[in-house]
Amino acid sequence: MPAKKGAVPPEIYQLKVTLLGTSPPIWRRLLVPSDLTLAQLHDVLQAAMGWQDCHMHEFSVGRRHFGRPSPDDRLMGMPPVENERTVRLSSVLGRVGAKAIYTYDFGDSWEHGLLLEKRLAPDPNTAYPVCTGGQLACPPEDCGGIGGFYDLMDALGDPAHDQHDELLDWVGDDYDPDAFSVDDVNRMLTPARRHRGKASKN
């Protein structure tokens, strides 16, 4: 459906995404259209951080929870989950300084702090979303959460550790915890680029 004549282009949100509990922090800075649904934002966060989207996830803002609702949630006594496909980013993060939590993998419980740093006018020559900065590679999937990740780093950094060789084989020779490239992240974000500083057609 074509955008209505005179439709206002979505604002661009500058978000800082920090993997909580990491030191030094693993983080990304992203420019994303404010009219993304939270389901679309999930895809952006997976690509930007370097996750593989192998597990469940959820957004939380205050007492509200957003994700993929299941009839089993109520039976298990879990808080009600709003459908992330119908909620836009601008409706949950509206003011500069607003925060949310994005949790990925309920077993390892990777919690990401989302901070709205700026609200910007869109650049008509830029395809969004865009990564503008960051630091360090995200942990390997299924490594046991923050505690397991740092135990893994200790073992990989100590050739005398009794599990050094086994864990090195598990993560693979190409895993570098210090690696980060804006260009690489932006290549991963390419499939999510639907906005070029113009109004959404949705």
What residue spans do the PLM features occupy?
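Short linear regulatory motifs enriched in tryptophan with gly/pro/ser
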Residues: M1-N202
